[in-house]
């Protein structure tokens, strides 16, 4: 598998759906789309979750997302519904996403950022940002997810509550 343009400044991955309040003791999950025709190496990519004064970071150090693929980052791969996802990545073992009563993402309010750090730099740049609860109008109840409408990756109005989550089935 060749990875092209892995170090360029305008890498694009899209966070397309987020499950922060799973039902029936299910796993939290983040759906990521690679819309490019080339694979993207995960080295240099990171996730950040902030809620109140608490912040959690996860730097990905290996892995590749194939071109035009859909990936699920999950708190528990064994209980995750995967739909048409090409890749399923366990972030529960890394302590970033939870399952059941163990929360990685705050149920009530939070900010989730997908970030990329250039190989010669130390500071990551946000590639996408999702916010719920707090000052937003996005208040989740158990079993609802947040889904991206395909527009601005930083605008909270680009996100809506989904009553029937669709892990691994983004068609944008």
Place the predicted regions along the sequence by residue.
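Intrinsically disordered, low-complexity linkers and terminal tails enriched in Ser/Thr/Pro/Gly
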Residues: 1-172
